[in-house]
């Protein structure tokens, strides 16, 4: 008898129009994984932030067509994975998209999954590197809302997956040139307190970059890992991407910037990297090259497809592990997904 498999792609979400910016911001900051405070304090803070930041965020989204492109980018990835899986897989399957802070929310997706009536569910985050604030939050929210007894296999991360690394390397090589350049691998930032609490995100970012640099095989490659999108006065991961662009500008080094934790084009790449950070580079009259996100890159889609095939073929039920089929983080990282949901 054929399996019926429900595959769920997790992503952040985003406003479909600038009128939805405030509820999107509220949902984001009301998440306990983002602001770890009890209610009603967290509710009040999320309300205040969403009101205060609404107009500024609307102006940012107005620069890219008044909406987030992440939703349609994720839909393209879903279609690409579906097409590739159909070439290989004999089992019946449907791929669903579940956004954390905008529609379609987990509750809506679970209703659709019930109608499909699968024999198992596979959860695949579109966050290559695990964090309790992204994949962890999405998985916990999904599991809290699901009310059917179906085996669930969860892919927590794939920071060193072979084809994921190859996809980055192939795109970077297309943009390399024989000049005085520095590569900045720019990842979304996190408050340091989250890392100190045992989150493996920055460790996995380093693992990804180390693998890419090794595969690039360029002698004395000048590169740095940087972090962007800082919000608020608390201490965040360093160095900031903005700071490193300023530093490179003073040294008259050209910049090649790689969005290492983003697999879809959205506001942080299209505005922050393409407009705000490019402005800094232009100020110093240095060349600024931004590498595209992986999107529907064939090697990347192959990577996700291969991960799914491996998990479909596993006989274990209620499985939680990395794409490598083993724990890849040292034990000191206590915010591993296995610890969070068990």
Curated annotation (Swiss-Prot):
InterPro entries with a match to the protein in the record: Ferrochelatase, Ferrochelatase_AS, Ferrochelatase_C, Ferrochelatase_N
What is the superkingdom listed in this entry's lineage?
Bacteria
Q: Name one GO biological process term.
A: heme biosynthetic process
| Enzyme Commission (EC) number | 4.98.1.1
Q: Which UniProt keywords apply?
A: Cytoplasm, Heme biosynthesis, Iron, Lyase, Metal-binding, Porphyrin biosynthesis
Main enzyme class: lyase
Q: In which compartments does the protein localize?
A: Cytoplasm
Q: Which cysteines are joined by disulfide bonds?
A: none
Indicate the family of this protein: Belongs to the ferrochelatase family.
Specify the protein name. Answer: Ferrochelatase
Give the species this sequence originates from: Rickettsia typhi (strain ATCC VR-144 / Wilmington)
